[in-house]
Amino acid sequence: MDIKQLREKSADELKAHLTDLRKEQFSLRMQQVTGQLPKTHETRRVRREIARVKHLLGSTK
């Protein structure tokens, strides 16, 4: 998701999105450990999106 789209969301929506991203990150990590992850770039994308959401949550306080 683009940073502009994230800025339009409320803090509660960002927290919910962060929870979903962390679940996705855990799932991707488990797939990577078991050797079942065909698209390894997805872990990087999720990690960066988590950083974007955390940045926005920190700046709104």
Curated annotation (Swiss-Prot):
GO molecular function: structural constituent of ribosome
Keyword Ribonucleoprotein annotated: yes
Family per record: Belongs to the universal ribosomal protein uL29 family.
Keyword Manganese: no
Keyword annotations from UniProtKB, A to Z: Ribonucleoprotein, Ribosomal protein
GO cellular component: cytosolic large ribosomal subunit
Source domain of life: Bacteria
Gene Ontology BP annotations: translation
Gene3D superfamilies reported in the protein's UniProt record: 1.10.287.310
Matching SUPFAM superfamilies: Ribosomal protein L29 (L29p)
Matches recorded under Pfam families: Ribosomal_L29
Protein name: Large ribosomal subunit protein uL29
InterPro entries: Ribosomal_protein_uL29, Ribosomal_uL29, Ribosomal_uL29_sf
